[in-house]
Amino acid sequence: MAVVEILDISLTETVSARLRGRYLRAVPGTLNTAHTMEITGWVLGRECSAVAVELVNKCNVCLRAPVNIHSPDAAAIYPGVTEAAYSGFSLNISVLGLTPEIEFLVQAVLKDQNRVLIGVIRARRLWRLRSA
């Protein structure tokens, strides 16, 4: 059975000139069956709203998802920020065709179309024998 193991997640600094906050829910050590990875979280722009999140591998945007999912945890952390309530995103990507060792840059796309790095996710594809 093919699995994808998340090896490491490195997040950028929370406070920046363009991002108010971000969170990734991919957990190191997580094994995903088949050839897919699911990455969820939330992101808040500071002066310009985050409208999408992209996964980039070797300078190519592999997947883009809108920032529009209900995120009560972000709303609780930033109660005075209106867009915090719907600052969530979900990315489900197939890693077929990528090298066995995978690295994704996770970047926010702001309303003005600037990109801001959220973090880096390293993973690997491997085969696991089924238990008897």
Range-by-range predicted roles:
Residues 1-132:
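Basic, ligand-binding patches in group-transfer machinery
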